[in-house]
Structure formats: structure tokens, C-alpha cells
Amino acid sequence: MERLGLIAGNGQFPLVVARTAKGRGYSVAACAIRGETDPSLEKEVDALTWVEFWELEKLLDFFKSQGIHQALMAGQVRKERLFKESRVQLPSRVADQALLAIVVKSLKEIGVRLLDSTYFLSSDLAQKGCFSKRAPTPEERKDIAFGRDVAKRAASFEIGQTVVVKQGVVLAIEALEGTDQAIRRGGSFGREGVVVVKMARPRQDMRFDVPVIGPRTIEVLREVRASVLAVQAGKTLLIEKNRLLASADEAGLSLVGI
């Protein structure tokens, strides 16, 4: 039986990966991050240990003890913890990608290859075009094009993946707070009918921090009465896709792959 190491952050992504991998005959050993990972993951995997997000050596020791040679990252760690946790010492101006590169290098040194985060879920990547019942209006399409350009630039500067726009005005750009709070912030300015655009980095490494949307994203969009969510086709993962689409259609949201 093949073994998979799972580095599990927050949200449903790690649970979906674990279930899918188990369904394909893998034995899954998960490294769960305190304060982030859903505790119910323990029921979905064969072995699990809890670590603080800065305890890289503990993660490596666990994978070595489990005989892991391939691993996958799923779910995020809230970025504000990098600054709030007193035990974490970061070099100035360090980027997400630099931190993750350290993890990749450390895994490689113990013989563990890091797979793409979408390895088991490639069929759930967003396709190009409208995949909701309601298509965007001409005005919404203008905002999608505008938001796409802004989001691509923001992602290239490691600022964030998501922007909120309305009538050609930028209402919010995702920063440290994450996607949900950025949507809420933009929605508070634009009120009903904002357009949300989520893009990958220009040279997105699919092993980590891939754009993800799920039912929780739709809940937040409904909360602020957004009208459109546009995501990068081929790079954005749709978690619990059927439930996500049903919720979007119920709310009259337009979902578009660009």
C-alpha cells in the first residue's frame, strides 16, 4: 500500500484530500497544525500527530517514523500568526514562497517528494467559462476584466490572490487577513453587487498555496450580497464542487473561470 504524508492546514481541503487518497488505496499519515487543522481529520487518516506551525523538525521526524516518501500540503495557516506568535523569528521582508521553499528543501533532505496540492483533485480545478446557472451581465464582465488585471498584479507582489471591485473601483485587495475577510471588507464598501476576482501567482507553484474556493466562500459571498466570483481557470480548486455550485445557484451568484 502506498503511503502519503499530509501537511494539513485549515478548512475542508485537507479532509477532502485525505478521503480521496484513502479511496484510492493510500495509507495517509497527517501532520496537523494546532489552531488551524479541523480535529475531525483524525477520523479520516491512518496516523496523525499535532504540531505547532513552526515545529518543522517534529514534522520531519513524524514523516520519517511513518516511512513517508511523498507528501502533500493542503489548507493554509493564517498568515497573521507569523507575526503574533512570539516564538517565530522571521527575517525581514520574507515572502510566503521563501518560507515554503525551506519546507520543500527540508523534506527533500529526508527523501520526501512534495506533490502538487491538486494531485488527487485535478478534476476539480475550475474550467474556463461560466459554470453557474446565471451568466455575468455585460457590466459585470467589465468588472471581471478589471479585477483580473488588479488581482494578477497583487498576486505577483505576494500581496494576496483576491480583489473586490465594483463599477471599475477597487474596494479591497486581500492582504494578511485572508480571502473571507477581504470579501467582507470590500462588501462593506460596495454593498450589494460587488464582483470578486481570485487569481493565482503569475508562476504559481501548484505544490502550495493554490487558490481554493468552497462552500464557505459562497457563504461569505452571500453574506455581502456579491454578484460574481471569477477565478483563474486551471489553477483554482473547487472544494466540494457540487455543494458549492448548488449554493451559488440558490443565491443567484455567477461563477466564472477566466
Cite the ranges covered by each PLM segment:
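Conserved mixed alpha/beta catalytic, RNA-binding, or beta-rich assembly cores of soluble enzyme
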Residues: A21, G35, R93-Q97, I110-I218
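N-terminal basic/disordered segments at the start of proteins
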Residues: E2-I33
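General beta-strand structural signal in soluble alpha/beta enzymes
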Residues: L6-A8, A30-C31, A71-A74, D96, ...
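N-terminal glycine-rich phosphate/adenylate-binding segment common to multiple enzyme folds
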Residues: L56-L121
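Short glycine-rich anion-binding loops that position phosphate/pyrophosphate groups of nucleotides
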Residues: N10, Q76-K79, V169, R201-P202
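Short coil/turn connectors at secondary-structure junctions
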Residues: M1-R3, R24-S27, V45, Q66-H69, ...
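Alpha-helical structural signal in soluble globular domains
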Residues: T20, I102, S106, I110, ...
